[in-house]
């Protein structure tokens, strides 16, 4: 069931979103050659704990870390470890924080040093596809209006959207109804109502939309080995413009 948040609950979600966005900004600043993905995870864990919050991802369905760090052809759910970031990598970080009974969730993909023009274009198209969808995150629109706008922008730029993984409602639980696909035709799904909180997260492949699940049970890669990018924010539906509960100011490239 889709839950509409009260004014008090929205304030709590703003608090969770602020911490989550700050954790993303910290992770972004750490994306540099020579840094290990485990170092990013450790720093994000400590930052979230220092704010009095709990990392949403840690032990979620058995996930072993506080942040997902996915590099190059890894689309999502990369487990941090000994991997050393290299010049030219693109690095996706996905972060969640839980405080006051509510979650925040956001992600972004960032260049490690100098990257190719095509890699940078993939990152920017993925970011902009989120904002194309955001235009329809308004009371009275249909959920699939967001989905269709994301897909149209991505495909117009020659990339493809992942279909097996989608955005979601968010609140007291990390994943709540409704699912928010990054593809579809406009005019379908539930109408958006003020008080809804959703995480919209385009996952975009440079080549084919096909994916591969890795043996670790978490990491998802592109089937063709080409790069992927990911961008996400937690959104509040209002009577007017949507409110981004995870401030995107320090999340863009």
Named regions from a protein language model:
Residues 1-253:
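Active-site neighborhoods and metal-handling regions in enzymes and metal-associated proteins
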């Amino acid at each position: 069931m889709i839950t509409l948040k009260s004014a008090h609950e929205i304030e709590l979600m703003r608090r969770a979103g602020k911490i989550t966005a700050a954790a993303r900004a910290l992770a972004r600043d750490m994306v540099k050659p020579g840094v290990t993905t485990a170092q990013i995870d450790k720093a994000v864990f400590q930052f979230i704990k220092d704010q009095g919050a709990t990392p949403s991802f840690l032990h979620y369905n058995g996930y072993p870390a506080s942040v997902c760090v996915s590099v190059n052809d890894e689309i999502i759910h990369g487990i941090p470890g000994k991997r050393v970031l290299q010049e030219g990598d693109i690095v996706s970080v996905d972060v969640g924080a839980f405080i006051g009974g509510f979650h925040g969730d956001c992600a972004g993909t960032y260049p490690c040093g100098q990257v190719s023009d095509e890699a940078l274009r993939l990152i920017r198209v993925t970011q902009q596809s989120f904002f194309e969808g955001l235009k329809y995150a308004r009371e009275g629109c249909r959920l699939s209006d967001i989905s269709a706008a994301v897909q149209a922008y991505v495909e117009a730029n020659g990339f493809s959207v992942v279909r097996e993984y989608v955005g979601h409602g968010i609140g007291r639980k990390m994943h709540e109804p409704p699912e928010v696909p990054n593809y579809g035709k406009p005019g379908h799904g539930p109408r958006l109502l003020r008080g809804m909180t959703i995480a919209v997260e385009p996952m975009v492949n440079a080549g084919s939309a096909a994916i591969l699940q890795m043996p670790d049970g978490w990491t998802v890669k592109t089937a063709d080995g080409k790069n992927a990018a990911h961008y996400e924010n937690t959104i509040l539906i209002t009577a007017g413009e949507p409110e981004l509960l995870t401030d995107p100011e320090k999340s863009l490239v």
